[in-house]
Each structure stands twice: as C-alpha cells, then as structure tokens.
Amino acid sequence: MRRILALVLCLGLLVFPVRGSESEKYVALTFDDGPSGRFTRRLLEGLDQRGVKATFLLCGYRLKDYKDTGRAIYEAGHEIGLHGYSHDNMGKMSYREVVNEIADTMALLPEGCKPVFLRPPGGASSEALSQAAKNAGLALLNWSVDPKDWAIHDAAAVETAVVDTVQDGDVILLHDMCESSVDAALAIVDRLLGQGFRFVTVSELAAIKGVVPQPGQMYCKFR
C-alpha cells in the first residue's frame, strides 16, 4: 500500500509541477541610463556578493563609451534591455526616429545579447513608439516603484521609499549613475532579502507570474 501511495504521489508531482509557494515574494530591480563606468562596476560587485540578478536598461550613447562595462553586465548574468540611444523623449519621435534609436542601440549590445524590453526614457508612450517596438520584437517596460533616486541623492531616503511601498511582483526603478544610487540599491537588497523577498530579472518575474511579454505592449509590474 505504501509503495502504491508513493507511486501515486510521484505521478501527481509529474502531472502537476509545483511552481513555488504562493507565499514567496518576487521583485525585479531595474537600472536606467547606464552604463556609467565605476558606479556600474561597484553595483555589479555588490549584486554579485549578494547573489542577486537585475535588469539594466542601457543607453546607446553610454554603451558607445563603456562597451566593456556593458559586456561585464551581460557576462555577470544580468538581463539587458534598451533605454534608447540618445535618452531623448521617444514619445515625441516619429516612427522612423524610434526605429533608428532602437537599431543604433542594438548594434552596440554585447554579442549574443537578445533584449526583450525597451524602456522609453521618462516612461513615454505613443502609437509610433509602440509600433516600432512591436516590429523590433520588444515589449515596453515602465515601473511600479520609483523612489526618484536620480533627483534626491539621499541613499537612506531612497531605501525607505522603496522598502515601505514594495510589493510582490513590483518592478523597482533605480539608476547606476551616482554613488548614492548604488548605496541605496545595495541597502534595498539587504533589507528586502531580510524580509523574504527574492530578486529576479524582469523576464524571470514575468515568467514566474505566468506572463508572456508581448512586443509593443507596456508592462509596469507582474502580479
């Protein structure tokens, strides 16, 4: 009888795979505007020490000057997405201008890198932008938690703003362009790990939540 019960249980596990406890909490850290050289390198080191993967939305004009850092992001196992080439408002661009922004940035990505997401600077949107992203096979990505680290330059305040509001499935917006942002990011990781959160890339978060990102569609969080 015990052998029969064990066999039934094993078959049940094969037929109904476990995706993880419903009590598990997942979030995605995202970093805009880079790469930035020493700040990005310090961030990569800190994330590696904590076993955390993130998603970096890179600008083409920055990649042009920091190709080695872009390669380091990719080789460390982080996800790379696009943030346009010029960091100009893509919501005000023509279809052809958006296409060029995407193509010029794609040409600078590390070999083998196949991005899933495009984050328009400022979270901009337009029909031309959506169509260009769709035709390039890119989903659009915004965010659900924004502590405005780029403006306040106060690591403790940024940390508090995120920790006090973050929920399972959130996409956190940060930057890797200054010391205070890196300090805040690593402090946030430490605090949320202590609260039982698990950090994953945006693509991983979507998969965990059963979402298949569609080209041209905008996503802010995954519940």
Regions found by a protein language model. Give the residues of each.
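C-terminal domain-boundary segment and adjacent tail
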Residues: 21, 49-51, 64, 180-223
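Residue-level detector of anion-binding/catalytic polar loops
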Residues: 53, 79, 139, 146, ...
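Alpha-helical scaffold elements lining the catalytic groove of polysaccharide deacetylases
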Residues: 42, 88-113, 122-168, 181-184
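Hydrophobic h-region of N-terminal signal peptides that target proteins for export
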Residues: 5-18
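A cross-domain feature marking catalytic cores of carbohydrate-active enzymes
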Residues: 31, 58-61, 82-84, 120-122, ...
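Active-site beta->alpha N-cap acidic-glycine motif
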Residues: 18-108, 114-115, 187, 207
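Conserved, mostly hydrophobic/aromatic
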Residues: 32, 47, 80-83, 118, ...
